[in-house]
Regions:
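Cyclic nucleotide-binding regulatory module and flanking cytosolic helices
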Residues: 1-41, 86, 91-93
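A conserved hydrophobic position in a structured secondary element of the catalytic/binding core
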Residues: 23, 59, 81-82, 105, ...
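Small beta-barrel nucleic-acid-binding modules, principally OB-folds
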Residues: 36-40, 46-49, 166
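Cyclic nucleotide-binding regulatory domains
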Residues: 44-106
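Structural motif
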Residues: 63, 108-110, 212
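Cyclic-nucleotide recognition modules
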Residues: 79-137, 141, 145
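Polybasic "coupling" helices that flank or enter modular domains
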Residues: 105-107, 122-190
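Phosphate-/nucleic-acid-contacting segments
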Residues: 164-255
């Protein structure tokens, strides 16, 4: 089934998704014909617990959250997926069943790959499989570090860390989310998030308009943040995704 608004496969497909951009040429040529660019809508659910995974999404623009949920507590964010990553990780582990909810928080676009095709390609290419498994390790590191941060670090650092990671994953300084969404994903009260962001605004580190936060001084935001953001970035650097990021930025400047 094709998503409404899906675009036709271009003959020469390039992508800002850094996981795909970091692939060797042979593996990119292997996977490229099977990818289809589709829009991502806000609140679109890409995976639901205890249901079969239908597609793998390589996010190009936008932001999705990985959430654990209970009936009593609702959703709690355990990870973010943006231009550095992909969904459908169960397929890499030999299962088609989702265990966590993945939903779009900032709309954008993705390259979509059918689940059966993804499984076949991972089986055919050891390099694709290793890349996917390395990404799973990076996402596990992110989830573990976020759990530690949410449990042990003050609200000031948690909000700063969330904004920095969201900015990295989006690739732009404007993070169009509400205070309520950040609060929901952090598992805290909205007022606590609003207080911290208003402090940042008063210091000139961020500016705000309705449901959008713009990072004005990233260096200042990083200077008074816990080390969790740096540790998560270090794991993605190990995958050479930050090298792909710099190459993409240089290519954009040359155009």
């Amino acid at each position: 089934m094709t998503d409404e608004g899906a675009e036709a496969r271009p003959e020469a497909l390039t992508t800002p998704n850094l996981l795909l951009a970091a692939l060797p040429e042979a593996e990119w040529a292997l996977i490229r014909p099977h990818l289809q660019r589709v829009p991502l809508r806000r609140k679109q659910v890409l995976e639901e617990p205890r249901t079969e995974i239908q597609h793998v999404y390589f996010i190009e623009r936008g932001l999705a959250s990985v959430q654990a949920r209970t009936q009593a507590d609702g959703a709690h964010g355990v990870g973010l997926v943006g231009r550095f990553g992909m969904t459908g990780l169960g397929i890499l582990l030999g299962t088609r069943r989702a265990t966590l909810r993945v939903s779009v928080q900032v709309p954008g676009s993705a390259l979509r790959l059918g689940a059966e095709e993804a499984a076949r390609l991972m089986e055919a290419s050891a390099t694709l499989r290793r890349t996917g498994l390395s990404y799973i390790q990076a996402l596990m590191t992110q989830s573990a570090q976020l759990s530690l941060c949410n449990a042990r670090h003050p609200m000031k650092h948690r909000v700063r860390r969330w904004l920095l990671l969201a900015r990295d994953w989006l690739g732009e300084d404007e993070v169009c989310v509400s205070h309520q969404l950040i609060a929901d994903l952090l598992g805290v009260r909205r007022a606590s998030v609003s207080e911290q962001i208003e402090c940042l605004e008063s210091e000139g580190i961020v500016s705000q308009r309705r449901a959008c936060i713009t990072l004005r001084d990233r260096a200042a935001l990083e200077a008074d943040c816990c080390e969790c953001h740096r540790l998560v970035r270090a794991e993605y650097r190990r995958l050479n995704l930050l090298g792909a990021e710099r190459a993409a930025e240089r290519a954009a400047e040359d155009r």
